[in-house]
Amino acid sequence: MRHLIFLLSIALFIPFQAHAQPQQVKTGVYLMNLYDLNMDEHSFYADFYIWFKWKGRIDPTSIEFVNAIEKWSMDKATFDGDSTPVSLKTGEKYKIFRIEGRFFHSFSLNRFPLDQHQLDIQIENPEFPADSLQYVADTMGAQIRNTLNMVGWDMKGSEIVTKVHDYGSNFGNPEENAQRYSNLSYQINLARPLSYFLLKMLLPLFIVMLVSIGGLLLHPTHIDSRSS
């Protein structure tokens, strides 16, 4: 009898555990263009591809860009007009989109002119909380177009960071607990090159100092010139 109860307990426990596991979604980003860093308005523009690979019943592509200011477009990056996911040999479903938009970033200039910045693009799925859906980084999921150059900046690479975003609020719905969502952040590392500091800051200062010293060394017969 005890063995029967034990087996029944196991049978009930296993489905519960399987149901408790959130559906994982492998996510990757390929940055095409980055431009118009506006430190006064704390914003930047980005153009990139984002893809999703998953197994399960939930379609994870109904995403929200948490720090988006303007989203110009979100187009499925296929040419056959079919909006259904692609079935991979691994048994996973696959979708890829191309995104263009303007995003918020709070620029810190404490280390100007040798400042460094970590721009980020954050996504969440507002339809499914973290206990149902979880975004994870795909293998080699953070990439930058190898011909992408930004004048006045050095590209220091990119990475994907995931976490659970706990809002600490049920947003006015008394029947819901505090909302927690899987948050995926694509981070782009930028730094001003040393040449910017030398050419834009030190060189003009050095020229002014040379002119000032040269004026002091003028012969007294050129006093009028020195005074000027």
Where are each of the predicted segments found?
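Bacterial Sec-dependent signal peptides at the C-terminal "C-region" and cleavage site
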Residues: F13-Q23
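Bacterial N-terminal signal peptides
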Residues: I5-P15
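Channel- or pocket-lining gating/hinge segments that regulate access to a cavity or pore
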Residues: S185-S228
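Soluble non-transmembrane domains of integral membrane proteins
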Residues: Q21-S185, N189
